[in-house]
Amino acid sequence: MFQGETAITLDDKGRMVVPVVYRDLIARMSANRLVLTYNPFEAGCLWLYVEKEWERVRDELMVKPNAHRVVRVLQQKLVGSSALLELDANGRISVPSSHRSAVAIEKKAVLLGMGDKFELWSEQAHHALIQQTLSDGDLGDGLLDLRL
């Protein structure tokens, strides 16, 4: 569905242009609506879902018993802190300042198409992740059976 890496520049109002290649698909899948939330696994990164996929993720998470602290924290970070965004006539979305500041996105960002969602990274965090991944040398046994 979504794939690829795109350098993004946010304007002074925190708006970013969604790449043209994705706009038609987003329009068809969710009437130009995206849901923005925090990535609980990586600092410096936000997740963007088309509305329908977000509803699946949200519903799956919200049926979990919140008596467990980790479930409650995930529900708060993912669902409680989510924001519904709509593409404007120029194909832009406005990233809330609270989300931008939490992941240190100022002007420069990187948008990654990750299949069922996008990851929106601060440029610095994305660069650091790439450097760390390349320098680790060992990506773990989980990739041994993957044909690349």
Curated annotation (Swiss-Prot):
Residues 5-53, 82-125 form the SpoVT-AbrB domain. Keywords: Cytoplasm, DNA-binding, Repeat, Transcription, Transcription regulation. It comes from the Bacteria. InterPro entries: MraZ, MraZ_C, MraZ_dom, MraZ_N, MraZ_sf, SpoVT-AbrB_dom, SpoVT-AbrB_sf. One of its GO terms (molecular function) is DNA-binding transcription factor activity. Its main location: cytoplasm. One of its GO terms (biological process) is negative regulation of DNA-templated transcription initiation. The keyword DNA-binding applies. The keyword Repeat applies. PANTHER family: TRANSCRIPTIONAL REGULATOR MRAZ. This is Transcriptional regulator MraZ. It comes from Xylella fastidiosa (strain Temecula1 / ATCC 700964).
